[in-house]
Regions:
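Blade-level signature of beta-propeller repeat domains, shared across WD40, Kelch, NHL, RCC1
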Residues: 289-342
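Beta-rich, blade/repeat-based domains predominating
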Residues: 39-52, 65-66, 86-103, 130-149, ...
């Protein structure tokens, strides 16, 4: 009996010698909320009003030659209508309502412009043409006066346009807003914190979130940009909650990363779990843009194959190539407790 008892003692000592991990992420699952109709693909930007979600398509697959904004019921996720944006390209990105004017604006990457769109008919007009000749308008944010801030992924710039539109001015240009990385998009998602004392900018190719301090608010001169947090794999769209936590779509990690105002990660939500028999991603696949509403975070599954841009394959490229049905996912916006020491 000595050997069995000795084995038990040795096993107990070995187990006691291991230090438990500091934390393990209790990932809330991402479930399908809505499915894009036939003829539309690659949902990127997302916004919401009292009754509807509006989803802008970045259609690099050639499904259509015009830009599409797909409208879903806010409660059920049922498809209601598709707005065809005939005065723009098929490469639509960030979309948002100006909270001051009520205008629906969308970034048209292919047209190097921001469009104003009628949310009922899809009729559009140019709101802000992007200067410089190589514009990459990607995401939108607004200050309390209704001024519009536009991230430019290709010119390392945040532009500012007045509430009624017009040619924007370069508000901030900085190397931290550009990239030589993959995916080849620099400045991307935008979000002001609650007191408008800083503007946060996701840099997708650099895997960073950049903080632009605003010591006198948006009306004053912006401070020097600084890296707020790095190693967010493919930092894309941003949302910010009432506690000033940043919700970041990590498009190369297939997850939503939540960081608190100090930059400490407090949650990693969602994951990718393959392609279902209908050709739709299960969970998150190249998530692009989050929006927080009704106790959930809604996320567009862009499912973009980077090889279509002549780039080397990413780890999810072969999966994205299999997607034939494009989706919007939903995750509980409750921050789950950590499993482990805190």
């Amino acid at each position: 009996m000595i050997l069995p008892r000795l084995a038990v003692v040795v096993c107990a000592m070995l187990l006691a010698s291991f230090t438990p991990p500091a934390a393990a992420w209790n990932r809330s699952p991402a479930v399908r909320f809505a499915t894009l109709p036939a003829g539309t693909a690659h949902p990127e930007g997302i916004t919401v009003d009292a009754r509807h979600f509006y989803v802008a398509n970045f259609d690099v697959s050639g499904e259509t030659s015009v830009g599409n904004i797909v409208v879903f019921d806010r409660r059920s996720g049922r498809w209601l209508r598709t707005l065809q944006i005939t005065h723009g390209s098929s490469l639509l990105l960030g979309i948002a309502f100006n909270p001051v004017t009520g205008d629906l604006l969308v970034c048209d990457l292919g047209g190097q412009q921001v469009l104003k769109v009628d949310p009922q008919t899809g009729a559009s007009s140019v709101f802000a043409p992007i200067p410089g000749g190589n514009g990459g308008p990607n995401a939108l944010a607004f200050d309390a006066e209704g001024n519009v801030y536009i991230s430019d992924s290709f010119q390392a710039t945040i532009w500012r346009a007045p509430p009624g539109g017009g040619i924007p001015v370069a508000w901030v240009t900085d190397p931290l807003l550009g990239t030589a990385g993959i995916p080849p998009f620099g400045a991307n998602g935008l979000a002001f914190n609650g007191h408008a004392s800083a503007l946060f900018v996701a840099n997708t190719g650099n895997d960073t979130v950049v903080r632009i301090p605003l010591p006198d608010g948006p009306a004053g001169m912006p401070g020097t940009p600084e890296v707020f947090v790095n190693s967010i794999n493919g930092a894309d769209g941003l949302a910010i909650d009432s506690a000033d936590n940043l919700w970041i779509a990590a498009n190369q990690a297939d997850e939503i990363v939540v960081v608190n105002p100090s930059g400490r990660v407090i949650a990693k939500l969602g994951d990718f779990d393959g392609i279902d028999r209908q050709g739709a991603p299960v969970g998150l696949l190249f998530p692009a843009s989050p929006v927080l509403v009704d106790g959930f975070v809604y996320v567009t599954n862009l499912a973009l194959d980077l090889r279509g841009f002549g780039l080397p394959q990413a780890v999810d490229s072969q999966w994205t190539a299999e997607v034939t049905r494009h989706t919007i996912a939903r995750i509980s916006a409750r921050i789950p407790p950590l499993r482990g020491l805190q």
